[in-house]
Structure formats: C-alpha cells, structure tokens
C-alpha cells in the first residue's frame, strides 16, 4: 500500500475554513488541532493525513516534499517565497487585506509628501520594503512577530503593516488604515514532484477543492 498523501495546514482560520473544502472531497479530519497535542492528524480517508505547522512554514514543508500539498495565505507566499511551488487554485478562504495603519490623527499623507523617514513595525518586512520603495517612501522597518497595534501606542513605530479583516482591532487601539497594500486570500500549493508522481492520488482533492472554492464552499 502506498504512503498516504500529506496535507500541510496551519491552526486557526485557515484550518477551519479548509474543513468545508475537505468535506467536499468526502474527508473529515479525525481530531481538532486546537485540543489535540498531535501534529500529525489522521483523516477519514486512509490515503490522506494532515500535518499542523506554522503558517509561515507551510511553503517550506511543501517545497521540500515533507508535505505533498498545503494551504497558505498570499501574505506568506509573497513574504517567504512560493516560486518553487505549483499554485493551481485561489481557494477564496481566509480573506483579508494587508494594509498600512497609523494612529488616528497622524497625517500620514503629509509626512510622506514632506519626505519624513517613518518607523514601521511589521512581520512582513520584505513585502513592506518593496511597497514603500515603489512609492518612494523612506522607512526604517522594525521586525515584530505579533501585537503590531501596540508598537505605535508605545512610541516604537509611527506606523504598522499588518493584516486587517474587520478593522475592529485597529479601531479598538485608535489606529486607522491609510493604505491597502494587497488583498489576501489563501492558495492551494502543491509540491512539483508530487504533482508528477502522485497526480492520480492528488487529482480528486484538487478537483474537489477547486469546485468548492468556486461554489463558495
């Protein structure tokens, strides 16, 4: 019997919003990663298992063949690189946007016009660097791993670059969006070798995911 396919997912919103896609393929994950300590989860299909990894690590697991396919946000693929991966489907899940936000009352447009050098906190350093360089904005980028909204409140940064869904967290911390960098959704990513060597096993999942994503799950 051949080894099962391995699907790489991250905990949280991507995992939850991938479940209906798996259901469309007739598959359920046997355990909840929020309550289970296991990082390799069986499914109701003996030919598929799910591994739970950090969101930023999904492309790496897939690129090097530790997973045959996975689900990764556009933010992760742009920041960490997805050029070595086949990206056949925009799954239209985990939708949000990457934006620049500043404290309410801070005149961002005027600061940019005057050529001010801004300190910007973000975990998306490469994406932010490219964005500001393209606009000719002078910035010092500060790498953080979480709680971006805190940085302007304590004087660490003038602005942040982060993902925004409803904007509720920004509003609660007296921050406002001033610029959208890109729209974000999650993509299916597939290992290039697996696509050739395991195409027969992969195809039912790819087809089911594509149908479900087009039909709004």
Curated annotation (Swiss-Prot):
Keyword terms: Amino-acid biosynthesis, ATP-binding, Cytoplasm, Glycosyltransferase, Histidine biosynthesis, Nucleotide-binding, Transferase
One GO term of the biological process aspect: L-histidine biosynthetic process
Organism: Burkholderia vietnamiensis (strain G4 / LMG 22486)
Any single Gene Ontology cellular-component annotation: cytoplasm
Quaternary organization: Heteromultimer composed of HisG and HisZ subunits.
Domain remarks in the Swiss-Prot or TrEMBL record: Lacks the C-terminal regulatory region which is replaced by HisZ.
Family: Belongs to the ATP phosphoribosyltransferase family. Short subfamily.
Keyword Transferase: yes
Stated role: Catalyzes the condensation of ATP and 5-phosphoribose 1-diphosphate to form N'-(5'-phosphoribosyl)-ATP (PR-ATP). Has a crucial role in the pathway because the rate of histidine biosynthesis seems to be controlled primarily by regulation of HisG enzymatic activity.
Reactions the enzyme catalyzes: 1-(5-phospho-beta-D-ribosyl)-ATP + diphosphate = 5-phospho-alpha-D-ribose 1-diphosphate + ATP
Localization of this protein: Cytoplasm
Protein name, as recorded: ATP phosphoribosyltransferase
The organism's place on the tree of life at top rank: Bacteria
Biochemical pathway: Amino-acid biosynthesis; L-histidine biosynthesis; L-histidine from 5-phospho-alpha-D-ribose 1-diphosphate: step 1/9
GO molecular function: ATP binding; ATP phosphoribosyltransferase activity
UniProt cross-references to Pfam families, sorted A to Z: HisG (PF01634)
Residue spans crossing the bilayer: none
The keyword DNA damage is annotated on this UniProt entry: no
First-level EC class: transferase
């Amino acid at each position: 019997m051949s080894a099962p396919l391995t699907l790489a997912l991250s905990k949280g919103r991507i995992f939850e919003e991938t479940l209906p896609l798996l259901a469309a393929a007739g598959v359920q994950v046997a355990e909840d990663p929020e309550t289970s300590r296991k990082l390799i989860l069986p499914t109701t299909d003996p030919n598929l298992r799910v591994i739970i990894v950090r969101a930023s690590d999904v492309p790496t697991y897939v690129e090097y063949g530790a997973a045959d396919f996975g689900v990764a946000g556009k933010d992760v693929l742009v920041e960490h690189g997805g050029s070595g991966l086949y990206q056949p489907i925009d799954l239209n899940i985990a939708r949000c946007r990457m934006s620049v936000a500043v404290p309410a009352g801070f005149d961002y447009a005027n600061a940019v016009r005057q050529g001010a050098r801004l300190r910007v906190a973000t975990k998306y350093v490469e994406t932010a660097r490219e964005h500001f360089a393209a606009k000719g904005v002078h910035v010092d980028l500060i790498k953080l791993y979480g709680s971006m909204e805190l940085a302007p409140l304590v004087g660490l940064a003038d602005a942040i670059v982060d993902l925004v869904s409803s904007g509720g967290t920004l509003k609660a911390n007296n921050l406002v969006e001033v610029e959208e960098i890109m729209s974000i959704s999650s993509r299916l990513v597939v290992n290039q070798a697996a696509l050739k060597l395991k195409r027969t096993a992969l195809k039912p999942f790819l087809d089911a995911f594509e149908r479900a994503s087009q039909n709004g799950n």
